[in-house]
Amino acid sequence: MAGSQLKQLKAALKANGLIGQTNIKKKNKKSKTPSETRRNDKQEILSNIRKDFNLFDGKINRTKRDVTMIQGGKFVKVGSKQHSDATRAKSDVENSMKLQYELDKKQHGKTGGLVDRRFGENNRNLTAEEKMLERFTRERQGTSKKKINFALGSDDEQDDEDNDGFVLTHSGKSLSLDNDLDDSKSNTKYYDEDSLMPEEVQPKRKSKQEVMKEVIAKSKFYKHQRQMEFQKAQDEIMNLDDEFGDIMTEFNNNPAKKPQSFSNKTPEEIEYDNKVRELTYDRRSVPADRTKTADELQKEHDTRLQKLEADRLRRMNGDYDDREAEADDLEGFWNGSEDEEEGFAIDNSAEEEGSSSGNEDDMDQSKPSGRTLKKTIIQIPGTHEDFIASLSSVDESNHCNYIKKVIETYQPRLAEGNKERMNVFVGILFKHILHLANDPCPPAENINETMKILKKLSESYNEKLVEVIRVEINDIQERIFNLQPRDLVYFVMVGYLFSTSDHYHLVVTPTLILMNESISSIPYDKKTTVSRIGQGLFIVDILLNYQTFSKRFTPEIVCFLEKAALLLIPEPEKLTNQSLSINKIIKSDTNLRTKGIKPTEDLVKVSELFGNDSQVLKLKLTNKLIDIFARILSIWRDNEVMIEILSSFSNLANHLSIHYNSPKLNQLIEKMSKIQNNLIKERKPLTLQHHKAISIATFAPKFEENFNPDKKSYDVNRERQELNKIKNQIKKERKSTLKDIRKESKFTARQQIADKKDKYDEYHKKMANIVNSISTIEGAEKNTYEREKQRRKNK
C-alpha cells in the first residue's frame, strides 16, 4: 500500500531531484538533475506535483460506458482528465467574460482616470532622445513669459493686439505668412472651366464597400443617439421616483377638506327638482319621415332581398358567428323559395309563387291611418280548441277573413301585451293547418290562404312557433312507422316557411334527420305496401326541394330509390344485382303487371297515399319515380359519386323501358348515358407524384503516386507552399477570432437582457407599491366619508 501524503510528496520530490543528494556522479548522463541542466524547469516540475496532489481540484465524471468526443481537434474520452480540463477552461472563460462585463457595466457613463498626454508617448517612430528633446523644447516655450515683439509666425491681429498696433513691415508691406497663404489661395481661386475634363468634374462613384461602411456608421450613430435618449429618460424617471416620496409626504400633511354639509331643502323644492328631472327625459317631437316614391320603395325592397340572399348563402356555407343560436335568429330564415313547393299536388303552387314575393301592404290596406284604438270586439284565442270554437260560428269561406280581422285587431302597436298574444296565435295557426290536413276532405283553398298568412306573420312572431314545431317533431318521431297526412303537410310547411339551404338550422336540421329516418325505416320485403312506397317518394321529393340550392348529397335517398324501383318495376328478378346495393332481389305484390301498362302523367294526391293499393296508383308512382330520377341528374350532376349512382339507376331505367313505354323514360335513359360517359372521361384515377429521375453522382477517384500521410501539401514550389500555409493559418485564426467575438457578443446580449428584465421588474414592483399606497389612502378617505354620511343620516 502507498504511504501517507507526506511520504508520497517526499518521494515525488526526491524522484525529480529536488531534494536529497544532488552531487552524485551518475554513469547514465541521459537523466540529469535540475541542479545541472534543468534548473529553469524547477517551477514547472513543482506545479505538476501540486496538480497531482490536489485531487479535489479535478472533476471526474463517471460514465456507464466509454464515450469519446472531439475536443480541441482530438478524440477525448468523456470524464477523463483531458475532458475535465477543457470543461474547466470553458468555465474559466465564461467567468472572465462575466467579470469583464460587470467591470464595463460599472465604468459605463463614468469619466475620470489618468490620460497620458505627453508628446510622442504613442509614437513608435521617435526615439527616446527625440521625445525628451521635444518635450524639453515645449516645456521651455510654455514657461517662457517674455514674448517677442516682432514674431514672423504670429498673426497680424494678435500682433496688433499684443504690440499696440505696431507691425513689422518692409517697403510698406506687412511681413506675415498669412498674406502669402492668402495670395496662394487667391491665385488658385480662378480657373478656366473649359480646361477641365469631364472626368474631373464628375464625382467618383462609391464602391459597395464604402456604401456599406457609411450605412454601418449611420446605424451606429443613430443607435448611440437612441441609447442616449433612453438613458436620459431613465435618469428622468429615477429623479421623479426620488421626488415621489416628498410629493406624497406633502399630500399626506395637507389637511383633508371637510365635506360640504347636506342641503336642507323644503318638500316643495324637492318636488320641483323631480319635475325638472322628469322633463329632461321626455321625448321631444321629431319631424316625420317624408312620403317615399314608388321607385324608392322598390329600391328598398330590392336591397332587402339582396341582403337576405347574401345571408342565405353565408348560412348555407356554414359561416356562423361564435355565439349561441337564439330563437330570434329565425327572423332572417323566412326567405324560403317558391320553387321548393314543387312536386305533389297538395296545394296551389301558382298562388304561392305570386304571394311569396309580396309584402304586408295588402294586409294593411284596410287599416285606418290614425292611431286611435279600436274597440276589441273579437277575442283572440289562447288555445287551438278555443280557435276551433270561434271558427264554428263563421262560414268556412270566411275563415281567412276572420283570421285577418283578428290580426288587425291585435296589432302590437295598439295595446300592451298584443305581441305576446300574437306569438301564441301564430303557433295556433300552425296547429290549425296540420289539423285541417288530417280531414278526409281537406279544404285546399283554406290551407293555402292560411299558409300565406302564416308565412307573413312568422317573419315577426317566431318564438312560440319554434316551440310548437319542436313538439310536433317529437310527436312525429313517436309514430315514425305509421305516418299521417298532417306529417307530410308538416314537411312541406317547413320548406315553405324556413330557408332549407342553411348549413345548420334550429328547425330544418331536426326535420331533415326525421325525414331521412322515415325513408330509411321503409323495409325491402313483401310486406311493404304501395301506400308506404308513395309516402317515401313524397318525402324524397320534399328532400330534393330542400337541397335545390345547396345541392348536398343524401345517401338515404339513393338507397330508398333503389328499393322503391325494385318494388314497382315488373319482373325485378331478371335484374342483376352487381351495381345495386341490395344483395337479394325479391318479387312482391307491389310490382307492376307485365300486361296492360299505360303510362300516365297524372299527379299523386296526398289522400291517395293513405288509401287502398291499386294499379293506377302504381303507375302514378312509377311516373313520379322517373321524375325524381331526372331531378337527381340536374341537382347532383357535379357530384363525384354520380358515376356510381348512375350505374345502378341506368340498369333500373333500362329494365323498366322494356315494359313501360314512355317518351319521358327514353329521354331519361339517353341523358343518363351521356352524363355517365362524360363523367367517366373526366375522372382521373389517383396516381403517385411523378418526380424527375436523378442519377447517382459518380466521381473519378484521384490517386497520388507519392502518397505520404505526413505531407500536407504536394506543391513543388517552396515559396507558394509557405504562402499557402500562412494563408491557412490566417484563415484559421480569423475564424477562431470571429467565433470568440460572436460568443462574447451573445454573452453580452444575454446579460443585457437579464439586466433589463431585472430593471423592469424592479420598476413595476415600485409602481405597484405606489398604487397600493394610493388605493389605501383613497379607501380610508371613502370609509371616513361613508361613516360621516351614515352618522348624519341617523340624526
Curated annotation (Swiss-Prot):
Name assigned to this protein: Probable nucleolar complex protein 14
Source organism superkingdom: Eukaryota
Gene Ontology biological-process entries: maturation of SSU-rRNA; ribosomal small subunit biogenesis
Annotated compartments: Nucleus, Nucleolus
Native source organism of the sequence: Debaryomyces hansenii (strain ATCC 36239 / CBS 767 / BCRC 21394 / JCM 1990 / NBRC 0083 / IGC 2968) (Yeast)
Keywords of the record: Nucleus, Ribosome biogenesis, rRNA processing
Chain spans, region Disordered: 20-42, 147-209, 281-310, 349-370
Principal subcellular localisation of the protein: nucleus
One GO term describing the cellular component: small-subunit processome
Self-association and partners: Component of the ribosomal small subunit (SSU) processome.
Record-stated family: Belongs to the NOP14 family.
Entry keyword rRNA processing: yes
Pfam families membership: Nop14 (PF04147)
